[in-house]
């Protein structure tokens, strides 16, 4: 919110946060800017789960990015990604299902690529685009922890009492560049060009970032959210331990 207020004054607002903790989905703070007809950027560092290119152990984090921009189509364009090929949550799912995972996701503790999720959970994650993801993750640490005077690299989450995570928030006030309705019209034209592109064989529709999530949100609001059964049970158990009301019923539905 501070970045948004700064953007109202000068067109762009940049805030670095230190001594923080997990801030959830990076799309959430980015979308706060969209609600004010701005472009939002949010990124955070994280625990050292990603191996630098050529290394066998983790030094940088998954370091997610969220970038959100308004459109005139009823939903914002939202990119919400971690900089690793996959996260350990997905690997846990593969492990529970007894399945092998792709080789380019993670390394064993010895630095070997593996398709065994159990071995991967003990090792390090790999960056998207090989060395490119590592480079982006390192520079995310620079823009958050190093610049903000907070934790970076091996430090975040190393001390449970002080998790020392750092974030970067940027808000860009579109009205300083052009009327927001003109921006939305230009966005819609751009999206139209993307959706009109020649499709690959077997592809029914070309989507833009955030579109699947928008459709899923509409479905969940109408029909209820779908959760992995294990996660549902974990949430119910946690609520019971904390004496929190959990007014939801476990209903098995077809995938």
Predicted regions and their residues:
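Catalytic-core signal marking the mid-to-C-terminal active-site face
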Residues: 155-255
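Small-residue-enriched flexible segments
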Residues: 87-149, 160-162
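Generic secondary-structure signature for well-ordered alpha-helical cores
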Residues: 4-9, 35-39, 45, 72, ...
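N-terminal nucleophile
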Residues: 41, 60, 64, 82, ...
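Short glycine-rich or small-residue beta-strand-to-loop segments that form or flank ligand, phosphate
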Residues: 13-18, 127, 169-175
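A glycine-rich, acidic short-motif signal
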Residues: 1-65, 69-76, 81
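Conserved active-site and cofactor/substrate-binding residues in soluble primary-metabolism enzymes
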Residues: 2, 24, 28, 62, ...
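Phosphate/diphosphate-binding glycine-rich loops and adjacent basic-rich segments that engage nucleotide
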Residues: 50-118
């Amino acid at each position: 919110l501070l970045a948004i207020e700064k953007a109202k004054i000068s067109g762009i607002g940049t805030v670095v946060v230190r001594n923080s903790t997990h801030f959830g989905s990076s799309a959430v703070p980015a979308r706060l800017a969209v609600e004010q007809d701005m472009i939002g950027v949010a990124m955070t560092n994280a625990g050292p789960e990603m191996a630098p290119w050529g290394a066998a152990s983790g030094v940088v984090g998954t370091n997610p990015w969220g970038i959100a921009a308004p459109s005139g189509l009823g939903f914002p364009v939202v990119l919400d990604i971690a900089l690793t090929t996959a996260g350990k949550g997905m690997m846990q799912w593969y492990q529970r299902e007894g399945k092998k995972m792709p080789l380019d996701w993670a390394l064993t503790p010895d630095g070997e690529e593996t398709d065994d999720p159990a071995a991967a959970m003990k090792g390090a994650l790999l960056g998207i685009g090989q060395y490119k993801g590592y480079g982006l993750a390192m520079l995310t640490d620079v823009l958050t922890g190093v610049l903000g005077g907070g934790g970076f690299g091996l430090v975040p989450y190393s001390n449970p009492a002080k998790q020392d995570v750092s974030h970067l928030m940027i808000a860009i006030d579109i009205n300083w560049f052009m009327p927001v309705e003109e921006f939305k019209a230009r966005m819609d034209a751009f999206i139209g060009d993307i959706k009109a592109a020649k499709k690959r064989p077997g592809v029914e529709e070309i989507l833009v970032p955030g579109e699947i999530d928008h459709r899923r949100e509409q479905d969940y609001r109408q029909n209820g959210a779908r959760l992995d059964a294990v996660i549902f049970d974990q949430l119910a158990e946690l609520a019971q331990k904390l004496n929190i009301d959990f007014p939801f019923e476990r209903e098995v539905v077809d995938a």
